A protein has these predicted regions:
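Non-catalytic, conserved peripheral segments adjacent to functional cores
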Residues: 1-40, 59-63, 68-121
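Conserved SET/PR-domain catalytic core that frames the SAM/AdoMet-binding pocket
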Residues: 39-58
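N-terminal Rossmann NAD(P)H-binding glycine-rich loop of SDR-like oxidoreductase domains
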Residues: 123-144
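SDR active-site strand-loop-helix element
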Residues: 127, 152, 176-180, 219-224, ...
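Adenosine-cofactor binding site in Rossmann-like domains, unifying the SAM/SAH pocket
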Residues: 148-167
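NAD(P)H-binding glycine-rich loop region in Rossmannoid oxidoreductase-like domains
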Residues: 162-200
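Catalytic helix-loop patch of NAD(P)-dependent Rossmann-fold dehydrogenases
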Residues: 195-207, 227-267
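A short helix->loop->beta-strand "cap" motif at the edges of active sites that frequently abuts
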Residues: 214-217
Length: 270
């Protein structure tokens, strides 16, 4: 059947040949576009996440191989989407008539393109959802009817605790917005507050950056102008860190850790 899966796929043929057909099931103007070609050992193809994949083997002893960039899981399987091989609107010229091909019972009952469900984008996780910024993000998401957002605070996901990361299937996420932080500037100067500030503002972002880098997730990290000494009215990307207190120092350390994630944005509030 034509299955769109929630990962990228690289397909090659070790021997023999196949007729391949791909249907774009991602939301947008390209939804429903079809591409077909014959693959043999001289040609491979990259199939992006959300593009439906199907093929017919054209020779005996054909060996079809593929590499994907995520592990199968039940949660991942729930995000699959499909379109029917026989949909006349796809105009796929199958070299082997479908009535002579081997198809599963499920393949026979997949929806036509007009009823097919677009592949949903990967989820967005928001940390620190009970803080001032987190509540504002949730309010915006709700007001605009945005889908695919998941909100966590320290009671559901303490992102400064390494042991909590294995609870999540990170391949399901495309973006993490880190709105969580220890923001009690004065209390950060106390012995107890100092430890809490460094845990939330430095260790937590470092752990988020690592998991985001491992899973090609975009990390949006909210920082502060406290990482500077206040000698300039306006701050640009080239200004060096010069924090004066524990809060600013811990935030600067977190910012440095976040830059190790290839796909990151750092936003500074003031």
């Amino acid at each position: 059947g034509i299955h769109a899966e929630p990962w990228d796929k690289y397909i090659s043929i070790a021997s023999g040949s196949v007729f391949g057909a791909w249907v774009d099931l991602r939301p947008g103007d390209s939804f429903g576009q079809v591409y077909t070609t014959i693959l043999d050992p001289s040609k491979a193809i990259y199939v992006p996440r959300g593009v439906g994949n199907s093929f017919q083997a054209l020779e005996d002893d054909t060996v079809y191989t593929y590499l994907v960039n995520a592990h199968w899981s039940l949660e991942q399987k729930k995000t699959y989407t499909f379109v029917n091989l026989a949909d006349p609107d796809l105009h796929i010229q199958w070299p082997i008539p479908l009535e002579d091909s081997e198809r599963s019972e499920a393949d026979l009952h997949h929806p036509m393109l007009k009823d097919a469900k677009p592949m949903a984008p990967r989820r967005t996780m928001v940390t620190g959802c009970n803080g001032q910024l987190g509540r504002a993000i949730r309010s915006y998401v709700d007001a605009h009817g945005l889908e695919g957002f998941e909100f966590n605070d320290i009671d559901t996901f303490d992102f400064s605790d390494p042991a909590q990361y294995d609870r999540f299937d990170w391949s399901l996420y495309g973006t993490v917005i880190n709105a969580g932080a220890y923001t009690a500037v004065d209390k950060a100067e106390t012995a107890e507050g100092r430890a809490l500030a460094w845990k939330a503002n430095a260790q937590g972002p470092a752990l988020l950056a690592r998991v985001c880098a491992e899973h090609n997730i975009t990390l949006v990290h909210v920082s502060s102008d406290y990482v500077f000494d206040g000698s300039r009215e306006l701050h640009d990307e080239a200004e060096a860190f010069a924090p004066l207190g524990v809060y600013g120092q811990s935030k600067a350390a977190g910012d440095i850790a976040v830059t190790n994630c290839p796909r990151h944005y750092i936003l500074r509030s003031s």
